[in-house]
Amino acid sequence: MSALAQETNESKPVVTEGGLAEDVAKLSVSEDKPLSESWLDQMTFHVGKIKLTAKGEIPTDQWLNAFCDRADKCYDILFGGGMLAGQLKGDINNSLTTVKKQYDANKDKFVTIEQMIEIEVKARGKKDCFKDKTSACIGQLWTYRALNFLCTFMEYMVKGNLTPSQCGKQTYKDCLERYHGWLARTAVGNAMGWCPTREKIIESFLFKTQEEMAEAANRYIAVLRPLLNQVIAIM
């Protein structure tokens, strides 16, 4: 495991490891259509369409199809719209666009996420790849960080012992704080607490109870977390 992967994996909360991952992996996920109109079930359906190759790698086109123009839609739910939600949506969309541009220019070579990273690093060197804001490596790294933020937020929400505002602040601390300077950490860290009530979030996810939302969130976690673990391990 690379130093980058080790550093990032250490930031995950305990809830993402061991029992939870094993439990949610047993949940049924529909392959025919989303189980509901909720963003959680919509994302579960599309992420569930990502099928590893015979070598166990992640097809780049399936990865992009799952997340482009979809992954950003929950920020308004989690943060009630406004400037922070807009910034987070812009960040994940820019990262996905960076990956897509590199893939579109190299479809014959960048067939899987693993091949994309391996080929680019071999050609340019890891240091150069991760300094270049237009590289596939940096686009994929920040895509991972954004998706890890969303997955971790929902893992905390499932536990139910924190308010949404506490979930937001803790998730930021776990997943993104280390990558921001002091001023950004202060401003963004405080803004992460501007979340709607749990009841409002449940309603915005199109559910009536915490239990219904938790079931859908667990389905989402079940399909997404293993892919995130696989992605960061190759960075």
Report residues per predicted region.
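PEST-like, low-complexity acidic/proline-rich intrinsically disordered segments
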Residues: 1-22
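Long, contiguous alpha-helical bundle segments
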Residues: 18-235
